[in-house]
Amino acid sequence: MVQRLVYRSRHSYATKSNQHRIVKTPGGKLTYQTTNKRASGPKCPVTGKRIQGIPHLRPAEYKRSRLARNERTVNRAYGGVLSGVAVRERIVRAFLVEEQKIVKKVLKLQKAKEKTAPKS
């Protein structure tokens, strides 16, 4: 006769957060063992891609006590938050904006010089 199995917790619905495995104990009984969800790892909010160099863990596992700082981040600006492509894009955009400001300033000075030159 097949042994009947009962969930060990009160949560009785077959949801994603309540997944179980059937395991045989050393005493020969079958029991349910809760399985952990697979970790997808951190994603870049800009590109949506996985961030390279950071392990795929559940959110609680990234806490200070469980993971060293060098395993939680990547050694660059926005390391561990944005992907390398997104950071490069931001740096280039910031540079181009600054260049545009300088060009605008130079053009304004040239215009002012032209206005003052013909008068004298």
From Swiss-Prot:
Per its UniProt record, what InterPro entries does this chain match? Ribosomal_eL34, Ribosomal_eL34_C_sf, Ribosomal_eL34_CS
**What domain of life does the UniProt record list for this protein's source?**
Eukaryota
Its Gene Ontology cellular component terms are:
cytosol; cytosolic large ribosomal subunit; cytosolic ribosome
A Gene Ontology biological process annotation? translation
Task: Enumerate the residue ranges of region (Disordered).
Answer: 31-50
Instruction: Write one Gene Ontology MF term.
Output: structural constituent of ribosome
What's in the keyword line of the UniProt record? Ribonucleoprotein, Ribosomal protein
List the Gene3D superfamilies: 6.20.340.10, 6.20.370.70
> Which protein family is it in?
Belongs to the eukaryotic ribosomal protein eL34 family.
PANTHER family from the xrefs? 60S RIBOSOMAL PROTEIN L34
Protein name listed in UniProt: Large ribosomal subunit protein eL34x
Q: Which gene encodes it?
A: RPL34C
